[in-house]
């Protein structure tokens, strides 16, 4: 058979009742899935096979189901991703019998690994939109855990800008409190 789809990840939103979620791609073993949830506070939890979920449809070309032990709360998201180990387990001997299924599975696994690497590159990495671009595109995603800037051209965190703004506001208030004020509008401003 072939790996006839480029899909290697499915994502769903919980409704508080559903426990079964489809994955629409082939896996060679039930441990070849990475199942994660995202709560409404944007905390990511990696689920454990056998404890948090079970898998049906192993080695089916059109996929199977992840069955959660409890329903995913409303508003939570679930990601089901192929996570194939980077190993080569097919042993092909010289002068041995030719078993097409062994070759087919080995080539399928290579294709799955390429899809997995492509998925990481295309969906998760901060990258330039083109080789010609001189900037990185976050694709409308936030960037977390960024250090405070130390060089003039470094990116600044919200916390750093907020604290700098507070310092500036305090300086302006201090200067304003020491200024001479008159309420008559005909007096011109001092140089």
Write out the residue ranges for each language-model feature.
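N-terminal assembly/attachment segments of tailed bacteriophage virion structural proteins
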Residues: 1-107, 116, 120-127, 152-155, ...
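Small/polar residue-rich beta-strand/coil "junction" motifs that cap repeat-based extracellular fibers
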Residues: 130-151
């Amino acid at each position: 058979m072939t790996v006839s789809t480029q899909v290697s990840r499915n994502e769903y939103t919980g409704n508080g009742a559903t426990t079964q979620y489809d994955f629409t791609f082939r896996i060679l073993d039930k441990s070849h899935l990475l199942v994660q949830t995202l709560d409404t506070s944007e905390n990511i939890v990696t689920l454990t096979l056998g404890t948090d979920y079970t898998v049906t449809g192993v080695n089916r070309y059109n996929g199977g189901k992840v069955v959660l032990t409890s329903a995913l709360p409303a508003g939570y998201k679930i990601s089901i991703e192929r996570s194939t180990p980077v190993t080569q387990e097919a042993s092909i001997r010289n002068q041995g019998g030719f078993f097409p299924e062994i070759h087919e599975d080995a080539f399928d696994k290579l294709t799955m690994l390429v899809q997995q690497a492509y998925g990481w590159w295309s969906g998760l990495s901060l990258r330039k939109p083109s080789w010609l671009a001189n900037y990185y595109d976050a694709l409308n995603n936030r960037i977390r855990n960024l250090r405070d800037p130390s060089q003039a051209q470094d990116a600044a965190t919200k916390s750093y800008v907020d604290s700098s703004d507070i310092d500036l506001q305090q300086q302006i208030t201090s200067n304003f409190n020491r200024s001479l004020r008159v309420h008559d509008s005909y007096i011109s401003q001092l140089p």
